[in-house]
Design a protein with these regions (language model features):
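Domain-edge interaction signal
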Residues: 1-190
Length: 190
């Protein structure tokens, strides 16, 4: 089982790299908390056990993993920075699910992620009591996420791409639509 800290560091590192390439704004503590919740939820739904053992609580702005919140609280609303990238104690299966969740939810604003976690009937909404920071039961998270549309896996995305019509050169390489070649007779349609 992974540690919440490894999950958080992995997500921070992924979004830091995307931000360096102008593909993301970076990770704030509030955004991290919401993404931790979604990752835990989808992992529970898919594997019937938690990705990490640390509790998730219902705070004013949505689900929070307190140990992770405290670790990064010094950043306030600023972009999180962590130590230099390290090896993460995560399996390839865990990393893949985290990447799939980031692919689905990482594109949304923090405000929208907060709204999603506040959906009526969602685990946060069932236990939230202002100022109480009540624990959100793992079983309720699992039940809720089993009713949600599954995140597309990397494997499914590759399969979807492979089913599209494209040209393949005689040597087997794929010719993408924007490629232009003078002698199309050398190529076969797949």
């Amino acid at each position: 089982m992974a540690k919440a800290e490894d999950v958080a560091k992995f997500m921070i590192d992924i979004l830091r790299i995307k931000a360096e390439h102008g593909l993301d704004d970076g990770m704030t503590n509030l955004r991290l908390q919401k993404l931790m919740y979604f990752v835990q939820g989808y992992f529970l739904a898919e594997h019937d056990h938690p990705l990490f053992d640390e509790d998730i609580e219902a705070w004013k702005l949505g689900p929070v993993v307190p140990v992770i919140y405290r670790k990064y609280s010094r950043f306030n609303k600023d972009i999180l920075e962590d130590e230099a990238p390290t090896e993460f104690a995560l399996t390839s299966e865990e990393k893949e699910l985290i990447l799939d969740v980031l692919s689905k939810y990482g594109k949304y604003s923090t405000g929208y992620l907060v709204e999603l976690t506040h959906t009526p009937g969602a685990p946060w909404a069932q236990v939230f009591d202002p100022g109480q920071n009540k624990k959100i039961d793992t079983e309720s998270i699992k039940r809720y996420f089993k009713t949600q549309k599954k995140v597309s896996t990397t494997e499914e995305k590759i399969l979807k791409f492979s089913q599209k019509s494209y040209l393949r050169g005689k040597t087997g390489h794929i010719i993408l639509p924007e490629d232009s070649y003078e002698d199309w007779e050398e190529y076969v349609r797949v």
